[in-house]
Amino acid sequence: MIEKSIKAEIVKANARAANDTGSPEVQVALLTGRINELTPHFKANAKDHHGRRGLLRMVSRRRKLLDYLKSKDADRYTALIAKLGLRK
């Protein structure tokens, strides 16, 4: 799990308004943080298939949110993937 202070930092860095916690940008950033935190675990524990299922679920959810954001506002999408260092 992400520590509360780190989570608040991520929300603050990606929020569109002062109390924004539910925008796609914030949700994608939080999922990216959780995914990045779990990656070393799976390098050390390659046979943790039950945990990997949860990781793949998070990756899929992030992909769906990114697809939604791309369809609604392509400029925000490109800015977000550049900021988070995802692909391209």
Swiss-Prot record:
Bilayer-crossing regions: none
A GO term from the CC aspect: cytosolic small ribosomal subunit
Name this protein carries in UniProt: Small ribosomal subunit protein uS15
Record PANTHER family: RIBOSOMAL PROTEIN S15, BACTERIAL AND ORGANELLAR, SMALL RIBOSOMAL SUBUNIT PROTEIN US15M
SUPFAM superfamilies for the chain: S15/NS1 RNA-binding domain
Domain of life from the UniProt record: Bacteria
Organism of provenance: Polaromonas sp. (strain JS666 / ATCC BAA-500)
Lineage: Bacteria, Pseudomonadati, Pseudomonadota, Betaproteobacteria, Burkholderiales
Protein encoded by which gene: rpsO
Keywords: Ribonucleoprotein, Ribosomal protein, RNA-binding, rRNA-binding
